[in-house]
C-alpha cells in the first residue's frame, strides 16, 4: 500500500502525542516520589528532635525540676510537656515571642516544617491563666496535634478523657470537656485574656454553642481551662479545638483546679 503524506503526518503526530504523554507520566511519577520523600523527611525530622528531648521527659519519680533544667538548658523557651492519654500527643511545650516563631521550628529551636506544640504568646508560661491555648500543626500519622482528629469520633471522645501537662514545679491533670470546630479567627476561642467573670461567661457560652460533643460537668467560670488547637481538613480556616479543664494539680493542697491569681506574663 502506498504511504501518502497524510499517513506520515498522522504517524508523526502519534509519536509526538505518545512522547508528550510519556513525559507527563514521568513527571507525575517523579512528583509522587518527591512527595513521599518529603513526607518521610518531615516525619523523620520531627522524630529526631523528639528523640533528643525524650530522654529528659519530665518524670514525677525522678523529679520534675531536674528534668526541666535539662530541657531548658537545650532551649529556654520550653515551658511544659503535654501527654494526652491513648493518643500520640506526647511532646514538649514551648512559648515563643509570638505565635509564628514555632510554626516552623522544633522544640530545640531548629528549623523544622512540622513545628512544635506551643503556648499562646500572651499566656503566662507558668500556666496560671484562667484560659490558655496550645497550638500545633495537624501532621500525618498522628504526629504533633494530628491525633486531635480522634476526638471528632464521639465514641473515642467519650472513652478517652484524660491527659497531663508536666511543669517544672507541678503536674496539671486534664479532663476533656468539649470538642469543637471553629474558625481560625474566632474572637472568643483564641482570646487568652479574660479578666472578669462576666467575660468568661461569654467564653463558656461560645464553647457550648460551637461544641460538637461535650462531657462531664458543665464548665464554669471557676474552672481553669486549656484549649488544644490544630487545623481541620473541613476548611482552609477551620480549626479543631479540644477544651480541657484542669481537675487537679499535684502541687495544690486542695487539688481543686480553680483559677490561680497570678495572671501577669513573665
Residue ranges and their predicted role:
Residues 1-14:
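N-terminal Lys/Arg-rich, disordered targeting/topogenic segments
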Residues 29-266:
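Solvent-exposed, non-transmembrane regions of membrane-associated and secreted proteins
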Amino acid at each position: 500500500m502506498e504511504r501518502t503524506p497524510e499517513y506520515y503526518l498522522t504517524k508523526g503526530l502519534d509519536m509526538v502525542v505518545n512522547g508528550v504523554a510519556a513525559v507527563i507520566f514521568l513527571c507525575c511519577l517523579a512528583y509522587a516520589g518527591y512527595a513521599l520523600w518529603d513526607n518521610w523527611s518531615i516525619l523523620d525530622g520531627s522524630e529526631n528532635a523528639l528523640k533528643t528531648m525524650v530522654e529528659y521527659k519530665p518524670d514525677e519519680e525522678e523529679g520534675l525540676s531536674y528534668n526541666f533544667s535539662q530541657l531548658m538548658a537545650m532551649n529556654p523557651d520550653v515551658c511544659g510537656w503535654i501527654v494526652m492519654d491513648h493518643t500520640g500527643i506526647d511532646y514538649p511545650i514551648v512559648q515563643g515571642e509570638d505565635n509564628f516563631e514555632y510554626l516552623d521550628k522544633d522544640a530545640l529551636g531548629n528549623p523544622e516544617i512540622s513545628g512544635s506544640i506551643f503556648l499562646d504568646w500572651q499566656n503566662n508560661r507558668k500556666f496560671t491563666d484562667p484560659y490558655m491555648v496550645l497550638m500545633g500543626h495537624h501532621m500525618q500519622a498522628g504526629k504533633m496535634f494530628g491525633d486531635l482528629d480522634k476526638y471528632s469520633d464521639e465514641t473515642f471522645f467519650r472513652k478517652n478523657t484524660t491527659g497531663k501537662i508536666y511543669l517544672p514545679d507541678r503536674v496539671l491533670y486534664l479532663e476533656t470537656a468539649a470538642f469543637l470546630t471553629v474558625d481560625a479567627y474566632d474572637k472568643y476561642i483564641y482570646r487568652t485574656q479574660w479578666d472578669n467573670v462576666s467575660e468568661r461567661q461569654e467564653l463558656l457560652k461560645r464553647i457550648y454553642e460551637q461544641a460538637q460533643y461535650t462531657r462531664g460537668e458543665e464548665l464554669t467560670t471557676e474552672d481553669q481551662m486549656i484549649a488544644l488547637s490544630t487545623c481541620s481538613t473541613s476548611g482552609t480556616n477551620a480549626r479543631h479545638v479540644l477544651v480541657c479543664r484542669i481537675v487537679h494539680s499535684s502541687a495544690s493542697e486542695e487539688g481543686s483546679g480553680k483559677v490561680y491569681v497570678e495572671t501577669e506574663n513573665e
